[in-house]
């Protein structure tokens, strides 16, 4: 039997692609006072075990917000964490209803420039091959089998000898309606010149859209990597918990372009906070009249 097996990697950033696997925290952050951090994987399945290979990687952030993994070592930029972090174990076996921790250790090489360093810790499931059967040993048969490989990543931020934040500005490109959802296109631009001296920093915070005192859009934990100068974000516009469904549960009411016509909206990029939006700690802002 002639069999072609295509391995498709289902990879997401911060979101597990394999059902039954949970991860905590959703990102790692190390500063001058922090030498190590831990990631915990939990197998919520009571029946199946899972095996994962653990790697450090660098992903290029594209202007549209997507990511491209850089596999050629010569193309990995200087702001990557891959050369300043160590981790163990390199593989994880998760038994049913069990958890395991991966420890990340920071080792600063001599002469490292101050700045923000970023990367991703990636967990890729190791699929076990099934034993061959009489049917699939038929030399005259031919088939193509697509095998998805569950994989997921979380970002790692390492800040070395810097305290200031990256300076960014915000611009808007108007409304975009796709698949029935109206969004506001927001562009974040870095203020530091790409060739200027000094460290390139991560811009990290929360994005929100306001119609007067009513928040109608929110993206928590938006960040622009040091090598990125322009980052566009599509922000769905809605009124939180404005509708009660038949089951008595609150749902968001998504706004249409007609409902927003003539309104002046304010966009805020505020200091990141794990608990709640800090509207009083504004890093950048802009307005748009629709």
Residue ranges with predicted function:
Residues 57-59, 107-161, 243-290:
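Terminal connector regions
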Residues 31-38, 101, 113-120, 180-184:
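Short, solvent-exposed loop/turn segments enriched in Ser/Thr/Gly
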Residues 38-42, 185-195:
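Short edge beta-strand/loop segments characteristic of extracellular beta-sandwich folds
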Residues 18-37:
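N-terminal edge beta-strand
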Residues 24-30, 91-92, 171-177:
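Short beta-strand segments of immunoglobulin-like
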Residues 48, 52-79, 189, 193-215:
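Short acidic, flexible loop segments centered on an aromatic residue
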Residues 3-17:
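Sec-dependent N-terminal signal peptides
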Residues 73-110, 213-257:
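Intrinsically disordered, low-complexity Pro/Gly/Ser/Thr-rich segments with frequent PxxP/GP/PP motifs
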């Amino acid at each position: 039997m002639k069999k072609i097996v295509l391995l498709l990697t289902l990879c997401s950033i911060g979101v597990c692609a394999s059902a039954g696997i949970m991860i905590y925290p959703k990102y790692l952050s190390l500063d001058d006072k922090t030498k190590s951090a831990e990631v915990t994987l939990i197998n919520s399945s009571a029946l199946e075990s899972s095996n994962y290979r653990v790697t450090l990687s660098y992903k290029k952030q594209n202007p549209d917000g997507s990511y491209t993994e850089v596999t050629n070592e010569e193309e990995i930029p200087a702001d990557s964490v891959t050369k300043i972090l160590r981790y163990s174990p390199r593989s994880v076996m998760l038994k049913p209803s069990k958890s395991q921790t991966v420890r990340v250790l920071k080792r600063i090489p001599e002469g490292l420039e101050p700045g923000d360093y970023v990367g991703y810790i990636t967990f890729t499931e190791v699929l076990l091959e099934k034993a061959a059967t009489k049917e699939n040993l038929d030399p005259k048969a031919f088939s193509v089998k697509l095998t998805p490989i569950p994989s997921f990543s979380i970002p790692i931020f390492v800040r070395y000898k810097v305290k200031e934040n990256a300076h960014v500005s915000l611009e808007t490109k108007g409304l975009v309606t796709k698949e029935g959802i109206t969004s506001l296109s927001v562009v974040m631009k870095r203020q530091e010149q790409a060739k200027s001296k000094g460290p390139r920093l991560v811009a990290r915070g929360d994005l929100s859209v306001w119609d007067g005192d009513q928040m109608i859009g929110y993206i928590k934990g938006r960040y622009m990597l040091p090598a990125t100068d322009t980052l566009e974000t599509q922000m769905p516009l809605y009124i939180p918990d404005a509708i009660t469904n038949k089951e008595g549960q609150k749902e968001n009411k998504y706004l249409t372009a007609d409902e927003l016509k003539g309104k002046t909206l304010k966009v805020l990029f505020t200091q990141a906070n794990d608990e709640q939006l800090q509207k009083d700690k504004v890093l950048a802002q802009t307005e748009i009249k629709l």
